[in-house]
From Swiss-Prot:
Binding site for ATP: G17, P18, F19, G20, I21, G22, K23, T24, R176
InterPro entries to which the protein is assigned, alphabetical: Herpes_TK, P-loop_NTPase
Catalytic reaction list: thymidine + ATP = dTMP + ADP + H(+)
SUPFAM superfamilies, A to Z: P-loop containing nucleoside triphosphate hydrolases (SSF52540)
A GO MF term: thymidine kinase activity
Organism of derivation: Meleagrid herpesvirus 1
EC class name: transferase
Binding site for substrate: Q86, R182
GO BP term, example: TMP biosynthetic process
EC numbers for this chain: 2.7.1.21
Protein name per its UniProtKB record: Thymidine kinase
A Pfam family annotated for this UniProt entry: Herpes_TK
Amino acid sequence: MALPRRPPTLTRVYLDGPFGIGKTSILNAMPDHTPDGAPILKVYEPMKYWRCQSTDLVVAANETPERRRGGALSRFQSDMIMASIQARFADPYLLFHERLSSKCRGKIEICDTPAIILMLDRHPVAAILCFPITRYLLGEYSLEMLISSIIRLPLESPGCNLTVTILPDEKEHVNRICSRDRPGETADRNMLRTLNAVYASLVDTVKYANLTCPYEKESWEMEWLGLPWFEESLLEEFISRPRPVICSRTRMPLDRTLLAIFKRKELCSENGELLTQYSWILWGLLTKLHTINVELFDISGMSRRECASAIMHTMPERLSTLASWNDLCELEDDVISYNKGMCNEVGASR
């Protein structure tokens, strides 16, 4: 009697982090196949969608706060425009995430020989969480709009690998942004510092969620009460504080996570407890992040090929997802269609 054929596996890796440090270049340097011949599919940043519709979203996102500061827009008008822009940034990620999630059947811990490797330029968490939080901390996005954005974060299917790339050398980061000279893009050092801090805190948040959800809600609520109010005086500390690496088996202190910035009197009762609806939202955020396998990848001093090689070297250690052969064939078509319709990369199917 023949043994049942083992279902194929899919390894998916999201490459994320602050803009301008070379994620797309790393993606382009990835090989088209593994040494065993498995295809490596690449999903690029949806720059065509962002820039080639009726509004250039990159330009609008940077111009709108300037218009408010110049008096051309009220705070309310600016908030509404920024919320709309940020939602449109997120739309392509959410669209592809929904299609991809339907093909992920279950998690296995390690797979040396996946049938397909999928490399994606950013996870939905970038447009829904990291950039809105950065804008909020810079005073360019309201707290209520930030809360509204967080609700949109989708549930994550098993087997998600998130690699957050960082480039601590601020001068090098600025040089890279200036050298690519994209219209409407600015190398604002304050924004870069804030964005880097947010991404570093995202890693801590995911690690906290890994060990807290779904069974430690009461413990989380007790830790929450011990957090200080996130007043303006804590903003600089959040941005500049050192974040030493903590063992993944040790629960991260809550004050190192992104949740700490939500300890605001607008969201809490007098004793510091979250109001019910905001408790649902923030606990929901943790539960959506808790299945993600996250790592911090410092690319300092590395060429794009060295970065790609390092990612490939650790591929056997990443989580994989069971799929079906029909799903994987459809996924390859989805990647080709998405890149063609949404992205500027020519012929970027693999």
